């Protein structure tokens, strides 16, 4: 297993979990990042890529749709949903319309920010980029004054990029959903986020089962054409009435996918099976489980020495390091 991160190995504890580690360039520099991946796959004879962040997925999505001939030079499979499914997932506006028209679940209709300049509306509202990630650019508008301020500070182009929706109060519900199109299997495991960071990562959750919500997720995954593991988010407006409003589908692992593993279902293994033709394990998690995340400190000094001793230069200025036999975390 070859791992990549934008930071040096000695800064990243998980660099100990892979056989070889490379420091990658920022994916926002798309051409440089594409060249990095091509060189890396060739050097390490990697036959599979598994992108884990939205910005990486956006690069690969453009690569395989707009630069198809160059993408073939990668000579590796990308274990990700098909381009059409990813395109829909990465556009919150199109996804909401897609689900609403098919009546698959409750959605929150919205309008572009530019349209609100001449409209009267009720508050509070939520404004967010239609292709945003990790709550970046998210704004809560409590009044007309908040709206006027946002309109004043946004360019005309930015006004077209913002989607504005009514704000619905409630817990954020995250559902890990894995679909194997060949076997027809779809497994879903929801969790209620009790504490979360400002960029939307849950730190204390309650894993639970809900037949109605899980069926909605199965219907969505099938309609969109999902393959592998994705993460769907909802607002739980009323727990007793099973009132859930769809927020988005991230076409990747959730940052909190380990919560599903802790509850008893290995989503990473299930994702791999969706691309290797194997059947998924049955999901046997029952009841409620409260699971909290904590951080621990690790000394990386021994890894520093290994990194220096094993450091090599690649054509894309990455560093690689063989994993020591005694490395552990």
Language model: regions and residue ranges:
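Phosphate-binding site of ATP-dependent enzymes
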Residues: 144-224, 235-245
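Active-site flanking residues adjacent to catalytic metal/cofactor-binding acidic residues
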Residues: 4, 127, 165, 232, ...
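Active-site nucleotide/adenylate-binding loops and adjacent lid/helix of ATP-dependent enzymes
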Residues: 86-169, 180-184, 211
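Short glycine-/acidic-enriched loop or helix-start segments at secondary-structure transitions
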Residues: 13, 59-62, 136-138, 174, ...
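ATP-dependent carboxylate activation and anion-phosphoryl transfer catalytic cores
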Residues: 44, 209-329
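ATP-binding N-terminal substructure of ATP-dependent carboxylate-amine bond-forming enzymes
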Residues: 1-78
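Short, charged, surface-exposed secondary-structure boundary motifs
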Residues: 12-13, 31-35, 81-82, 87-93, ...
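Glycine-rich phosphate-binding loop signature in dinucleotide/nucleotide-binding domains
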Residues: 40-46, 120-121, 157-158, 240
């Amino acid at each position: 297993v070859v791992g990549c991160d934008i930071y040096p190995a000695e800064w990243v504890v998980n660099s100990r979990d892979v056989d070889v580690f490379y420091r990658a360039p920022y994916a926002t520099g798309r051409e440089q990042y594409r060249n990095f991946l091509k060189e890396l796959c060739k050097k390490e004879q990697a036959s599979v890529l598994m992108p884990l962040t939205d910005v990486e997925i956006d690069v690969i999505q453009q690569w395989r749709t707009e630069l198809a001939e160059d993408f073939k030079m990668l000579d590796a499979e990308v274990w990700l949903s098909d381009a059409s499914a990813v395109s829909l997932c990465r556009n919150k506006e199109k996804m909401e319309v897609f689900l609403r028209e098919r009546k698959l679940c409750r959605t929150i209709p919205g309008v572009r920010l530019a349209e609100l300049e001449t409209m009267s509306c009720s508050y509070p509202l939520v404004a967010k980029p239609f292709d945003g990630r990790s709550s970046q650019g998210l704004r809560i508008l409590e009044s007309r004054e908040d709206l006027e301020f946002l309109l004043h500070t946004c360019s005309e182009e930015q006004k077209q990029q913002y989607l504005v929706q009514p704000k619905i109060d409630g817990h954020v519900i995250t559902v890990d959903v894995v679909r194997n199109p060949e076997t027809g299997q779809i497994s879903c495991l929801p969790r209620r986020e009790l504490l979360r960071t400002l960029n939307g990562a849950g730190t204390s959750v309650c894993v639970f089962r809900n037949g109605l919500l899980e069926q909605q997720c199965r219907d969505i995954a099938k309609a969109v054409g999902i393959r592998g593991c994705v993460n769907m988010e909802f607002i739980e407006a009323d727990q007793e009435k099973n009132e859930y409003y769809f927020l988005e589908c991230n076409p990747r692992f959730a940052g909190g996918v380990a919560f599903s593993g802790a509850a008893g279902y290995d989503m990473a293994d299930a994702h791999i099976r969706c691309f290797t033709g194997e059947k998924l394990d049955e999901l046997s998690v029952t009841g409620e489980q409260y699971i909290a995340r904590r951080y621990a400190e690790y000394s990386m000094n021994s890894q520093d020495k290994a990194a220096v001793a094993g450091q090599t230069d690649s054509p894309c200025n990455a560093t690689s390091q063989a994993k020591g036999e005694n490395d552990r975390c």
